[in-house]
Amino acid sequence: FSEKQQLVFGSFLTKEYSVESAALFNPSIVEHPVQSGLAAGETRFVLSLRSVGEGHISSVGFMEGVIDGAHHIHFTHQGPWRTPGVKSISNGGDDDHYNITFGDDIPLPERVIFPQSKSESMGIEDLRLVKFSDHGETKYLGTYTAYDGKRILSKMLETTEFQHFNIRKLKGSEIDNKGIAFFPRKINGQYVVSARQGGEKLTIMRSEDYMTWNHKEPLQQPNRGFELVQIGNCGSPIETPEGWLMITHHVGPMRRYTLGVTLLDLDEPHKVISVLDKPLMEPLESEREGYVPNVLYTCGWMQHGDSILIPYAMSDVACGFALLNTEEILERLLNNKK
């Protein structure tokens, strides 16, 4: 068949789908695996975004960019099209254990991870990415909530270059939660995550193999006015000499979402050193109207020099960036130490 004939045949078998037509929100950010060709003080990053299209189906899209020493952000150009990866089953036919591969000709900003199994048929929600290092090896882990329209399932993707992805479901008696976020390295020889339990409080969990989670320890529970509905993490912690900085979300009256920060012990992360006594960020008047109103939310942040870059969603209709001075936030936390 000629190329024109192939295009005609293909048009009858193709449906156009706009992955971002309803909402674009809940970003996560990590250092890009390629840091070559940059000027001093620059960091290249990967930004993931939750995209919602027709039928309220959530998928994962990507952007990439560079933040320079003056904190200016420059994004890589992206075209108008998004291309899903090619799926292959990798665990004896288990629909929840599969691989996704993108061709070399598809740039990262044009790749989309669309639901590929029954358990996530209605969406891949709130990917929390982390750059994970162990014995000199680096990989990227991302936890997300799979949704089939009735039930949720905690799943994880793993990649080294954002071209080939291995996707699996997490296991264990304590894993049926939302908002699971890995710490960026092992602690005392174990993998560690924070997670929301019971729909309202934060816990710490440990695992030997990073797939099976059977034990939890309490971390934080809502007890202040601006968080009485629930509290949860907003991505993986950042390591500092004073402890782990963990960004959190707090839900209060009128289901108003604000962001906060908690400082955890480096060696015993179930121990809280300090929490901010009031929200770090809250919706501005210009940010409160949207698909889900009165909400600020993020799924991760990134260290850049002496600052922390926070991508955040405003009421599920747009995303922006905030910059946090690491020394200043640590000083506030240590002055408010328990």
Per-segment meaning from a language model:
Residues 1-124, 130-181, 185-229, 239-291, ...:
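Beta-rich carbohydrate-recognition and catalytic domains
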Residues 232:
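Catalytic core of Fe(II)/2-oxoglutarate
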Residues 291-298:
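C-terminal structured domain segments
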Residues 302:
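Glycine-rich phosphate/diphosphate-binding loops that line cofactor/substrate pockets in enzymes
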